Design a protein with these regions (language model features):
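Bacterial N-terminal signal peptides
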Residues: 8-18
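Positively charged n-region of N-terminal signal peptides that target proteins for export
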Residues: 1-4
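Sequence-specific dsDNA recognition surfaces
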Residues: 67, 71-77
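Sec/Tat signal peptide C-region and signal peptidase I cleavage site
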Residues: 20-24
């Protein structure tokens, strides 16, 4: 009888440890929709520079105004999975665009967009920001210029998986 209890206990602990291991691999707690906390999240807590490029936009590619002459587009796992499935971006999706000058070396700005459920339903629930290369906040929040330009696209996204 003790053997049955021991086997049951070992099985329970194994399932418990596997479940906790899976939980640890999930995205870190999502950031607030405010400039400073979001910057900390994408540069320290869950650095976007370790993320993959958005599908079809690997490496540097030509850009246009108001962004840089050349761009790099990073996306978190949530955004990449939705893009590959052909779905709209879900809550927690983050895209980070590095904006470069004509020489392809001078980083001019970092312009992320973050889907935060309930943040701005009229603006697709996107939080927008523009940071200087040093992380200084140039604009953030419900940015009219971003919303006006992007609203003509499905889910406010110009970048579609290729």
């Amino acid at each position: 009888m003790k053997k049955v209890y021991l086997i049951g206990f070992i099985m329970f602990m194994g399932i418990f440890l596997i479940f906790n291991g899976l939980q640890a691999g999930q995205d870190k707690e999502m950031p607030p929709a405010e400039a400073e906390g979001f910057w900390t999240y994408i540069t320290e807590t869950n650095s976007y520079e370790k993320w993959d490029f958005f599908p079809g936009y690997e490496g540097m590619y030509p850009g246009k105004s108001p962004h840089g002459a050349y761009l790099k587009l990073y996306a978190n796992d949530t955004a990449i999975q939705a893009a590959k499935a052909g779905e709209q971006m879900p809550d927690g999706a983050i895209l980070v665009k590095e904006n470069y000058g004509k020489n392809k070396e001078d980083l001019m700005a970092i312009t992320p967009m973050y889907k935060k459920k309930g943040y701005n339903p009229d603006g697709g629930d996107w939080f927008w920001a523009k940071y200087g290369p040093d992380g200084s906040v140039e604009t953030s929040g419900k940015v009219d210029g971003c919303i006006q330009c992007h609203q003509v696209q499905d889910d406010f996204l110009f970048s579609k998986p290729k």
